[in-house]
């Protein structure tokens, strides 16, 4: 699928070295911008990416046939979204979750392209991010995501949870 000057396709095994490089670039960017804790030095682990690829839920964003971004789009209930503190999800219906979105800095509009792609699969989306990830929080708010509350990973670490509904953004925009 092509969105603006970016194309989105399922990631394939030969993409893995470049995808790993993109995540390394993203971790360095996050650390340099005060968010070293969200992904640390190893997240996402290669095993997670291999599982995402095997399940057909890892996507490569390309510009002129070169990978510039990556994200996972996951269908079904996310167990970490069962408990939410300080708020509520705006809807209780099937959703897609955007996880592990990252770019290598060579293209603009990766998040917007990911959002347009995800909207083709569902009118209701969820995502979470670390409170120190100011860049992602800005992108979420700029693109019509609404803050819902705090969710917790298995290890107890909190994340800010957001959702997006095509209907609510169409009415307000």
Where are these regions (language model features)?
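A short beta-loop-alpha structural element at the N-terminal edge
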Residues: 6-21
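Conserved GNAT-fold acetyl-CoA-binding loop/helix
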Residues: 27-47
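A short helix-loop-beta-strand connector motif used in the catalytic cores of GNAT acetyltransferases and
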Residues: 47-60, 77-79
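Conserved beta-strand in the GNAT
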Residues: 60, 66-76
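Conserved acyl-donor/pantetheine-binding loop and adjacent beta-alpha core of acyl/acetyltransferases
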Residues: 72-106
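Conserved acetyl-CoA-binding loop-helix of GNAT-fold acetyltransferases
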Residues: 103-120, 138-142
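Conserved active-site alpha-helix within GNAT-family acetyltransferase domains
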Residues: 112, 132-149, 157
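Conserved GNAT acetyl-CoA-binding A-motif
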Residues: 120-131
């Amino acid at each position: 699928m092509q969105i603006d000057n970016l194309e989105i396709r399922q990631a394939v095994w030969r993409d893995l070295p470049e995808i790993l490089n993109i995540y390394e670039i993203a971790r360095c960017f996050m650390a340099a911008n005060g968010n070293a804790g969200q992904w640390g030095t190893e997240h996402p682990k290669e095993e997670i990416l291999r599982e995402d690829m095997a399940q057909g839920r890892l996507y490569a964003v390309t510009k002129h046939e070169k990978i510039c971004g990556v994200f996972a789009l996951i269908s079904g209930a996310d167990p970490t979204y069962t408990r939410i503190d300080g708020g509520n999800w705006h809807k209780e219906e099937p959703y897609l979750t955007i996880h592990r979105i990252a770019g290598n800095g060579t293209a603009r509009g990766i998040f917007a392209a990911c959002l347009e792609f995800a909207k083709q699969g569902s009118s209701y989306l969820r995502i979470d991010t670390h409170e120190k990830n100011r860049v992602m929080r800005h992108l979420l708010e700029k693109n019509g995501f609404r803050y819902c509350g705090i969710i917790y990973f298995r290890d107890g670490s909190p994340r800010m949870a957001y959702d997006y509904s095509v209907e609510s953004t169409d009415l307000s925009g």
